[in-house]
């Protein structure tokens, strides 16, 4: 298989309210690199050939002038807009709604670019190079239905405050379900080697058909049209339960870094300095 047979979809339309800024273009590296710069570098090194960045229209110009110029040197980069008026024909949402419609909708908005096996990640999560390697390996396997990179809870905790995590039930290497757990830290009683989802997925192109079906069912059924969202893990869970999707859990020993809180940024900058010193990234 060639590099262009696998696509990286990056969800970058979220607002990042707790962090208090636009994390998608926040600099963390010594030369102004963002988290996404490192994710794209790791993906390109692993073998990915294309990136699809899902953004809101208001963010597009700033993003392309900063991060976009850099990552376009590494991958074939395309853009998709996640807006509340980008919907299946005949559907609409109230004009009073400001927040995006959720991560499942984000992937649906990029469907025209997803004609290859594809990975899905968050733009503001630092996943580590090894995770992209195992994900690329799975996506180039001809018998794969879908996959998820499973992190160890202890490798995803914040030193600043508690976090919410999708705790996974895994049986025979396959994902059975995900339960959202709130307020987790090292003393919350959940074993630190518990497998959790950090929204790092892999799918075949036909998964967008399932997204389309679920989005059409979700839109008229919203109880709160201002806040309700269709989440990607929820779509995956439904597909697992009805037997239409089998999700292989890929093990990673990588440490995940995020910036849930503003104070987490210093920890991430120190980690990047350390990885540069170890030769994982260029200074």
Where are these regions (language model features)?
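N-terminal glycine-rich phosphate-binding loop and ensuing alpha1 helix
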Residues: 3-68, 75-77, 82
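Short beta-strand-to-loop acidic/aromatic patch adjacent to the donor-nucleotide binding site
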Residues: 116-126
């Amino acid at each position: 298989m060639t590099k262009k047979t696998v696509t990286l979809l990056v969800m970058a339309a979220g607002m990042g309210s707790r962090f208090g800024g636009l994390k998608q273009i926040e600099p963390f590296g010594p030369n102004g690199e963002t988290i996404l710069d490192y994710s794209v570098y790791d993906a390109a090194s692993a073998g990915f050939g294309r990136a699809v960045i899902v953004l809101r229209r208001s963010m597009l110009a700033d993003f392309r002038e900063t991060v976009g110029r850099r990552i376009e040197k590494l991958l074939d980069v395309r853009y998709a807009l996640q807006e509340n008026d980008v919907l299946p024909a005949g559907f609409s949402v109230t004009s009073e709604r400001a927040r995006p419609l959720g991560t499942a909708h984000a992937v649906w908005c990029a469907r025209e670019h997803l004609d290859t096996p594809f990975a899905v990640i968050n733009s503001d999560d630092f996943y580590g190079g090894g995770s992209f390697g195992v994900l690329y390996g799975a996506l180039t396997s001809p018998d794969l239905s879908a996959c998820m990179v499973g992190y160890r809870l202890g490798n995803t905790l914040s030193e600043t405050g508690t976090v919410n995590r999708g705790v996974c039930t895994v049986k025979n290497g396959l994902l059975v379900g995900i339960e959202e757990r709130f307020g987790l830290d090292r003393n919350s009683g959940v074993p630190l080697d518990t497998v959790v989802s950090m929204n790092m997925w892999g799918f075949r192109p036909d998964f967008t058909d399932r997204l389309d079906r679920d989005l059409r069912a979700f839109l008229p059924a919203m109880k709160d049209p201002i806040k309700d969202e269709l989440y990607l893990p929820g779509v995956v869970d439904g597909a697992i339960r009805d037997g239409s999707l089998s999700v292989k859990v890929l093990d990673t020993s990588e440490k995940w870094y995020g910036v849930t809180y503003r104070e987490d940024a210093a920890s991430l900058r120190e980690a990047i300095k350390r990885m540069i010193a170890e030769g994982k990234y260029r200074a």
